[in-house]
Regions:
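N-terminal intrinsically disordered, low-complexity, charge/repeat-rich segments that act as generic
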Residues: 1-117
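Short, basic/aromatic beta-hairpin or loop at an interaction surface
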Residues: 117-134
Length: 241
């Protein structure tokens, strides 16, 4: 696969929630298999199983993939990113060593790595039940919401909103500095920008914000389409009436 050079943000971010410009976006054919190759199913299974150890959050696992070197991020397929991110997390959290990863063998002393955990994998029924429960991010409100339905707000840039330089955020770059209207309030939810870096959940109010498509992409002149995004409170500033 050819490696594509892309302009990065000021903080060096290659990953963006809204993707990168330059389309067109390919449409997946109808009826294609869930996994193009058998190893991809195993990649999903081992990632879910490792997540069950409770050593990292969903946000942290996403950021582990995002911080791959830019060349690797653009060259790897979807599940290759998953496996590279998982390897990073396993080493960083002391579950395996680099030597264990390279050899595929548990260290003889068993002092570090997977040897300290129960080797019995969860059953299919247990996995099914865990996935059905999910991991709800809703938390009790700690403060009143800053914005109300119908209010105009402006969106910060991803680099301004992120809690760490080049860090994790769920704010797409195409919405930066754009003005939208609050259409819904979802209550307080875990802030991914904080949670991905081990800085705590720091729940914030989450809003549905609506934009005109031709404001986001001027080439869509005359379009009556609207784009609605769920955005955390710290991504937004009020627009004076």
């Amino acid at each position: 696969m050819a490696r594509v050079k892309l302009p990065l943000s000021a903080a060096g971010r290659v990953h963006d929630m809204g993707g990168q410009p330059g389309g067109p976006v390919p449409i997946d054919p109808q009826g294609e298999p869930v996994f193009a190759q058998n190893w991809q199913a195993r990649a999903l299974a081992v990632t879910v199983a490792a997540g069950g150890l409770g050593k990292w959050t969903l946000d942290e696992s996403r950021h582990a993939r995002e911080r791959l070197p830019a060349e690797d991020y653009m060259a790897y397929g979807y599940y290759e990113k998953w496996m590279a991110g998982l390897a990073t997390l396993l080493v960083e959290h002391g579950l395996v060593t680099m030597d264990e990863l390279r050899s595929g063998q548990v260290a003889a002393d068993g002092a570090q790595g997977v040897g300290q955990y129960d080797p019995v994998p969860p059953t299919a029924a247990q996995v099914r039940a865990a996935l059905a429960r999910g991991g709800p991010s809703r938390r009790p409100d700690r403060t009143p919401p800053r914005f109300a339905s119908g209010q105009k707000v402006q969106v910060l840039s991803p680099d301004s909103a992120a809690r760490q330089p080049g860090g994790h955020t769920r704010l797409p770059a195409y919405a930066a500095h754009q003005t939208g209207v609050i259409i819904s309030h979802h209550g307080s939810h875990v802030l991914p920008d904080s949670n991905a870096h081990g800085l705590g959940e720091n729940p914030e109010h989450l809003y549905g914000v609506c934009f005109y498509a031709n404001d986001l992409w001027p080439e869509q002149v005359g379009s009556k389409d609207e784009v609605c995004l769920d955005l955390w409170e710290s991504y937004l500033v009020a627009v004076d009436a």
